[in-house]
A protein has these predicted regions:
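Extracellular interaction modules
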Residues: 1-5
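Glycine-rich flexible loops
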Residues: 6-7, 11-176
Length: 176
């Protein structure tokens, strides 16, 4: 059968159809294609773009105190050592922009040279990698750190996190 309008189907690496029916592309398609174009244009080996909506990370973008440059990176890194290891460049923040817009894509691209993962304020997270595991692990580990922070807050305390000295020791030990 042939596709109609803006419909598309999902195929695996051998071009076999893996979706049972044709599906419409996501409203985020322009952003994703712009990001792929950027990665290809820079000669980067990252071929995978993952966009998801991790509840705890999105919730944290609703707090203006976390939106300053590197504030959230520092906080999340301090919760568990794995976060710094999986996301050594940290997390960038893109102020709210209309989902699927070119403005959102451009703002995301501006963050990708400096950060491993980009959070879209009040929306979601985006990571890139050479394979699907890389961005998944980064976002998953950031989400775990956010869960630890929020669990502590829910129990009535603010988690202390690792000290600056502990974070520096981790950075040096793992060449981060």
């Amino acid at each position: 059968s042939s596709l109609v309008g803006s419909e598309m189907c999902i195929r695996d690496s051998s071009y076999a159809i893996v979706a049972e029916k044709y599906i419409s592309p996501t409203s985020e398609l322009p952003s994703h294609l712009s990001i792929h174009d950027y990665l290809l244009g820079r000669g980067r080996n990252q071929k995978v773009v993952i966009h998801t909506h991790p509840i705890e990370l999105v919730a944290m973008t609703h707090n203006a105190a976390f939106l300053g440059r590197d504030v959230l990176s520092r906080l999340l890194w301090s919760m568990i050592p794995e976060t710094r290891a999986f996301c050594p460049k940290g997390v960038g923040i893109v102020p709210y922009a209309l989902p699927g817009s070119i403005e959102l894509a451009d703002a995301t691209i501006a963050q990708l040279d400096d950060y491993d993962v980009v959070l879209w304020e009040k929306h979601g997270a985006l990571g890139v990698g050479e394979n699907v595991i890389e961005p998944f692990d980064m976002i998953d580990t950031l989400s775990k750190s956010a869960q630890i922070y929020m669990s502590g807050r829910a129990m009535g305390f603010t988690p202390a996190g690792m000290s600056d000295a502990q974070m520096q020791q981790l950075k040096e030990a793992f060449n981060l």
